[in-house]
Amino acid sequence: MMESLPTLLLATAYAPPVSYFVKLYEHIAGTIALEGCEHYIKQSYRNRCRILGPNGVQSLTIPVELPAGTKTPIREVRISDHGEWRHLHAQALRTAYGASPFFEFYADELMPFYERRYTYLWDFNAELLQTLLAQLQLDLDWSMTTGFLPPQSSEATSECCDLRYTLSPKLVAPVPGVQLRPYYQLHLERMGFVEDLSILDLLFEMGPEALLVLRDSLQA
């Protein structure tokens, strides 16, 4: 009998990196939980994604407001309208991927996220995640945690695949079980392959074949 997978525990993220979706693919038949009880963490994928523009890697950051400062629960983090970020992110995506093979194919589903106004970062990320899963044809269910599990607890280390703090733009360590497969990128010849960008990069460049890249990025 096949051994069941441990629960996959992830943080909420803005258009998460490819490795995040590789782990989702791996646990498609298992239990997946997104951390809903932590305090907000700065300089993380929770409100930041990385894309590849004509001048190199570019970070897109959603400005946020923290009603309780550093102790603000992740579900209470508010999106700030400071700096017209929606317009800037939409323009950055069009500049980076407007000439990519599948940008127009997905634009009608994804670009409206930069027109709607969301109050909470959690809600924006969750709805965008659902749309991304649908475009990838990745049929899975996830739930929100109901209590905080300390990362060093025995339960987190033995019963979970805990990647809440492993997947970070500040860490270069490989994600356990993931060996990212290179794929076509618009600026490949000039810049070489840049791995683990936002899933938007993979979708806009590879379209329906994105799911195959996720599959082939799992280490045996």
Describe the predicted segments one by one.
Residues M2-A220:
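Residues lining hydrophobic/aromatic ligand-binding pockets adjacent to catalytic sites
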